[in-house]
A protein has these predicted regions:
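Accessory terminal alpha-helical modules
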Residues: 1-304
Length: 304
């Protein structure tokens, strides 16, 4: 699945795609000749590789295959270049260790960071703007990490808000939201924030982000997703009165100590993360808002 995605990335951005170097091992003779103008100690020159040598890609197999597939669809890409780091092959064991080292020590950017820096993706950029325009989020969102440290003044994570917003409009990220859907997302979070008492206390400066994270579930990414799921159903069933329905959020006990969240968002006093728990939490929110569970959602409930 990664190869088609990388291939499409190349084809959709032929002028400004970005790749890191490939890494390969060569099991034959290699000879480096410095450029004449740089003398014998020059670091720039030509690398000669015996064509009978075997080349093993230690890092970049998916990129290499995606480039091959992209060239089939757009031969004009044939003039493009990619840098390659070559190592002398010291045997299978060494190549395997190199593969392990390269992949084990690679640092994968967080989902929040991908959203923050993805200027091509319209939804990502919309979410970045959203957290600066909705009062409860403004200045209280961790933009780079998917978790929040104990001392942080942030209450929410960027990826949590993004995921919950997608659930609200029933979308996967592959389809872009319309302008009307973007307006709905913004309006929804504004209405939700007005109906969660602790969020209002945070806006008023009468409590802190750390206190909310410590004592309540509603800043947690999983709970945000549940609020998004519930919102999608509430709006679908009450297109003209959903704002009134959301006033019932005031009646919910959002504290971690509440039995409502046990085995849904909380297990033995600790927040837990799994898809079933998010759906089960959404069921609580729906029922507290006076919405009957559908047959499918009741089946989820019955498994608890």
């Amino acid at each position: 699945s990664r190869i088609p995605a990388i291939k499409n990335y190349i084809l959709n951005n032929p002028e400004d795609y970005t790749f890191s170097s490939l890494t390969a091992s060569v099991d034959g003779i290699m000879k480096f000749t410095p450029a004449a103008s740089l003398g014998e100690d020059g670091k720039l020159g030509r690398l000669y590789i015996n064509m009978d040598s075997r080349l093993l890609i230690n890092d970049g197999q998916h990129r290499r295959k995606a480039i091959e597939e992209a060239l089939k669809e757009n031969p004009d890409l044939g003039h493009e270049m990619i840098s390659v780091v070559f190592f002398q092959d010291d045997g299978l064991k060494r190549s395997q260790q190199m593969f392990s080292d390269l992949n084990k020590n690679a640092v994968k950017p967080t989902k929040s960071l991908n959203i923050l820096y993805d200027h091509r993706d319209k939804f990502s950029q919309f979410i970045v703007k959203l957290v600066g325009s909705v009062e409860i989020f403004e200045g209280r969102v961790e933009l780079e990490k998917t978790s929040i440290s104990n001392r942080s003044t942030n209450a929410f994570t960027l990826n949590g808000i993004a995921d919950a917003s997608l659930r609200l409009i029933g979308l996967r990220k592959s389809r872009k939201p319309t302008e009307d859907e973007k307006k709905l997302i913004k309006e929804y979070w504004e209405v939700v924030s007005k109906n969660i008492p602790e969020w209002q206390l945070l806006i008023q400066g009468k409590t802190s982000s750390s206190e909310l994270r410590k004592s309540f579930v509603h800043t947690n990414t999983n709970c945000l997703n549940a609020i998004g799921i519930a919102g999608q159903i509430i709006i679908e069933q009450n297109p003209n009165s959903w704002k009134d329905v959301l006033k019932n959020l005031k009646k919910i006990d959002w504290s971690r100590a509440s039995s409502d969240w046990e085995k849904r968002l909380i297990l033995n006093g600790q927040m837990q993360k799994h898809a079933a728990g998010i759906d089960l939490a959404a069921n609580v929110i729906l029922q507290k808002c006076g919405i009957s569970l559908s047959e499918d959602r009741q089946k989820i409930e019955d498994k608890l």
